[in-house]
A protein has these predicted regions:
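N-terminal auxiliary segments of SAM/dcSAM-dependent transferases
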Residues: 1-20
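Alpha-helix boundary/capping and short turn/kink residues
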Residues: 17-20, 35, 58, 84
Length: 117
């Protein structure tokens, strides 16, 4: 997050849980293989989304803009048991990439991806 002062960013990084293996791999592969990797939510934003989702424990979430699935994974981890996250993206080229990481995260049953315009 380049918009935060370095001191605040460093503080957040120091006191935020480390990225798990799936999110780390997703972050890494997005930066290596995908055009415009800056669109990735990233670790600190993902942790904030996950925190809110776990606090609220929603039944349903609608995410507009899947990209490679990082934020979808973070949000879905806070769903109530049996809850669903519907994520919508226009880019068909990223569907398989995002779905593979959603599956690796063990969330394929609760994350429904919709692609197209």
């Amino acid at each position: 997050m380049d918009f935060l002062p370095k001191e605040i960013n460093d503080y957040c990084a120091l006191y935020t849980q480390k990225e798990d293996d799936v999110l780390y791999q997703l972050h890494r592969e997005t930066n290596q293989k995908i055009l415009r990797p800056r669109m990735l939510s990233g670790h600190l934003q993902g942790q904030l989304l996950s925190f809110f989702s776990k606090m609220i424990q929603p039944d349903k979430i609608l995410e507009i803009g899947t990209y490679t699935g990082y934020s979808a994974i973070c949000l879905a981890r806070g769903l109530k048991k049996g809850g669903e996250l519907h994520t919508i993206d226009i880019n068909e080229e990223l569907e398989d990439f995002a779905c593979s990481f959603i599956q690796k995260a063990g969330l394929k049953d609760c994350v429904k991806m919709h692609v197209g315009d």
